[in-house]
């Protein structure tokens, strides 16, 4: 290891977004990529043409992008308000925009836990980037479990971890939850939400709503009265802009102002800002196609549920989560599916299968039935 590097980095492993990519970074051709929870349909051709026109006619490539994201923030605030009981709670001062939600996660950790000021709490299995990002920054991670039948957070264990004092560990300063959770697909229950509301103001509650558009359940309205809550969302899923890396946070103005202080200047390219603004302006037509995801998710569930070797759970997101009798058998099924042309993600002891197109889902079902019929 290079002598100028932090010693703890030697034990870290780089995140691999698409394990099927070869050494040159090129994804294997013909592989159904159902491992990243991307929307299975690309942007419509007419929207791509509008983006191309904007690039040619409006974007000055020699100029830096809008560093304050002002137009996009206003558009996001308008969109967020549509799902709230009072449609004027949120304005641009409640919004911060990142180069993907990953940048916002890192910024939140920098503002709360750096230099042994705090630790984070996660309930696993969950989105791996909370742990990965914390570890790259030298921030301790405290993990608690979930109910193996429902995947509800073990709130008693979580509360005990928060109250515990350990000699070599700073206090927990951030609690990360996903609503609905990835990879398991379950939304936060009333009991889990009530537990989050009991957390003291010196603990930041981060609620990741990356899959909000698929479940239409949000806790964004809570930020008006809870200065220690923040909501994360993304344009990478339902809005089909994974290539553009646009994430955003919704929180009280005081917390947002701190995030704005520490984020990198010009962190979001002008073209990505244009794409997000265009997607929001066309949200009715884009989000209408979520109906396809719901239909296909239900079809996958109904087709897989009768298989004796599989255990699966209802999902409120754009994926389903399955397990076999052992983790080894589950992992092997994932490898066998990849060999047949379907790439899904093995995580948390189960397989997370993104809902694809009708044709992709047909192939997934055929291949699973073929493998488990042996």
From Swiss-Prot:
Coiled coil location: none
Could you tell me what reaction this enzyme catalyses? L-histidinol phosphate + 2-oxoglutarate = 3-(imidazol-4-yl)-2-oxopropyl phosphate + L-glutamate
What InterPro entries does the annotation carry? Aminotransferase_I/II_large, HisP_aminotrans, HistidinolP_aminotransfase, PyrdxlP-dep_Trfase, PyrdxlP-dep_Trfase_major, PyrdxlP-dep_Trfase_small
Q: Name one Pfam family in it.
A: Aminotran_1_2
Q: Does the keyword Isomerase apply?
A: no
Top-level taxon of origin: Bacteria
Enzyme Commission number, as recorded: 2.6.1.9
Enzyme superclass (EC): transferase
One function term, GO molecular function aspect = pyridoxal phosphate binding
Gene3D superfamilies referenced in this protein's UniProt entry, alphabetically: Aspartate Aminotransferase, domain 1, Type I PLP-dependent aspartate aminotransferase-like (Major domain)
**Which cofactor(s) does the record list?**
pyridoxal 5'-phosphate
Pathway annotation from the record: Amino-acid biosynthesis; L-histidine biosynthesis; L-histidine from 5-phospho-alpha-D-ribose 1-diphosphate: step 7/9
Positions of modified residues (N6-(pyridoxal phosphate)lysine) = 237
Keyword terms of this UniProt record: Amino-acid biosynthesis, Aminotransferase, Histidine biosynthesis, Pyridoxal phosphate, Transferase
Q: Name one GO biological process term.
A: L-histidine biosynthetic process
Q: Give the family this protein belongs to, as stated in its UniProt record.
A: Belongs to the class-II pyridoxal-phosphate-dependent aminotransferase family. Histidinol-phosphate aminotransferase subfamily.
Q: Outline the subunit composition.
A: Homodimer.
In its UniProt entry, what is this protein called? Histidinol-phosphate aminotransferase
